[in-house]
Amino acid sequence: MPSTVLAVDTPQGPGRCFVDPAEDPTALLVLGHGAGGGTNAADLELLARRLPVLGITVVRFEQPWRTAGRRIAGPPATLDEAWTAAVTELRGRPWAVGRLFVGGRSAGARVACRTAQAVGAAGVVCLAFPLHLPGRPEKSRAAELLGAGVPRLVLQGSKDTFGTPAEIQAAMGSAPGIRLVELPGADHGFRVAKAASFSAADLRARVLAEVGLFVGG
């Protein structure tokens, strides 16, 4: 069944929401895309297709810059403003019931962390959190992850050049409220080698199980 597409006005222009509703929802999960991809990223689509049967309505928000056909994302403040407006508007919909969780892939996870408290989220799902640019570990974004102020689930590939699980663990230290899950052999896009012992099917199952438990549990 195709997602329902909704237009959402924001201070940064119109964005789009792709809604996959649960029949008897207990939670709402709003997900954002990365700077280099859209709402059709494999992991975002996986969650949108499979979580509703667990009672979780999934909404994938397309930022206005991408809706407008631009290739480059705007500054973080503009992303946060558009996201906050969209999530706030969505919460007013009659089908948006249950506890609110936010999250996203890569840059979308950063936005979700920065705005979690402002939108009243119960938790944040981080898919491939970009701790730093490849080869630039000194430019850490750990403060965004650590400062979310709500429980966080971080799913990170062991071969992610934007930050390995070990790097994220080091940045976390003993900070409470963060569950870090390593995806063996996966890169930033959650791709694994065909011959890997931890297969693509294993990865999808792990992602679904972890997010389903975090949001629906």
Each predicted region: which residue ranges?
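Short beta-strand/loop motif that positions the catalytic acidic residue
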Residues: 147-149, 154-156, 160
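Short alpha-helix in the alpha/beta-hydrolase fold that links the catalytic acid
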Residues: 44, 138-141, 150, 163-172
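Acidic catalytic loop of the alpha/beta-hydrolase fold
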Residues: 158-162, 188-189
